[in-house]
């Protein structure tokens, strides 16, 4: 009952409580979705658990999205040109020319919705720009999880998006123990 209640509160179709934090949740999602050779759009801000789950355990092939760095070396958001379809298809073609020609060349995009350093993406923008190229998008919201409860952040919440029939499946991982009131590495 508590998972159903949480799904309702967070505006999710389903909610699963996972122990061992978002590291475990990221591996659950990536290992459920990916097989060897699948192309994955990969945000450089992603947590190591995604690299372990998606790239090592599942054997998927990364297509890295470049990120900005400030003068102090902090990684910022994904560079704007990385949301261009022609550019992404070109990157896909470098790894798998046949998949690059498919309507959805990427099995999964993994986006660090909010970074350790404070970058918070507009989820609507991400889905509108790359969603049609992906079967699924995993938004790792480990450092937030509160965006759906703050009106001015509603566009940052993948859980509040009105999705169309052509949009990808959406997964959101949250670290309830970081920014919310969860116990011991609850995700």
Task: Name these PLM-found stretches.
Residues 8, 22-35, 39-187:
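Conserved PLP-enzyme active-site core in the AAT-like
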Residues 1-25:
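Conserved N-terminal alpha-helix of the aminotransferase class I/II PLP-enzyme fold
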């Amino acid at each position: 009952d508590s998972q159903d209640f949480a799904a309702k509160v967070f505006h999710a179709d389903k909610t699963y409580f996972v122990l061992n934090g978002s590291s475990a949740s990221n591996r659950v999602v990536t290992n459920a979705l990916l097989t060897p050779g699948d192309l994955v759009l990969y945000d450089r801000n992603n947590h190591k658990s995604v690299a372990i789950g998606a790239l090592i355990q599942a054997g998927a092939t990364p297509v890295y999205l470049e990120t900005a760095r400030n003068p102090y070396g902090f990684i910022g958001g994904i560079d704007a040109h990385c949301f261009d379809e022609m550019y992404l298809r070109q990157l896909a073609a470098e790894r798998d020319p046949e998949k690059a020609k498919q309507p959805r060349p990427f099995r999964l995009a993994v986006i660090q919705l909010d970074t350790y350093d404070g970058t918070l993406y507009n989820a609507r923008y991400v889905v509108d720009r790359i969603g049609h190229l992906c079967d699924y998008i995993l938004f790792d919201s480990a450092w937030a999880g509160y965006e759906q409860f703050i009106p001015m952040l509603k566009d940052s919440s993948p859980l509040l998006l009105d999705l169309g029939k052509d949009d990808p499946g959406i997964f959101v991982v949250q670290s309830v123990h970081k920014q919310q009131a969860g116990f011991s590495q609850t995700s």
